[in-house]
Amino acid sequence: MIQPQTHLNVADNSGARELMCIRIIGASNRRYAHIGDVIVAVIKEAVPNMPLERSEVVRAVIVRTCKELKRDNGMIIRYDDNAAVVIDQEGNPKGTRIFGAIARELRELNFTKIVSLAPEVL
């Protein structure tokens, strides 16, 4: 469950290392974001000499959360960290690689480019 002021790791090579959620895209008063939701975030930590810089406002899609994700078949998935992938306005990732496992639910939400770049889909 991601809410405003939550810090997230970045699961791609876009140049950002850590994000802080400042808004959840969707309804005007949504409190929490889950896997597959798009957020507005600010870059808190970045790699030097990369296109994305610190204090830049970006959009990101959440790919991993510590909070459990229940599937229809009864399976529960939980990750060790909260992570997101930086995306552009069309929903394509800004990086060219994805690190770590991501959930299968992203394919159903039309983030197929992120799913194709991921090394493991759970």
Swiss-Prot record:
SMART domains, per database record: Ribosomal_L14 (SM01374)
SUPFAM superfamilies noted in UniProt: Ribosomal protein L14 (SSF50193)
GO (cellular component) term, any one: large ribosomal subunit
GO biological process, alphabetically ordered: translation
Keyword field contains Transcription: no
Location, primary (coarse class): plastid
Protein transport keyword on record: no
Gene Ontology terms, MF aspect: rRNA binding; structural constituent of ribosome
Segments passing through the bilayer: none
Quaternary context: Part of the 50S ribosomal subunit.
Family statement: Belongs to the universal ribosomal protein uL14 family.
Name of protein: Large ribosomal subunit protein uL14c
Lineage: Eukaryota, Viridiplantae, Streptophyta, Embryophyta, Tracheophyta
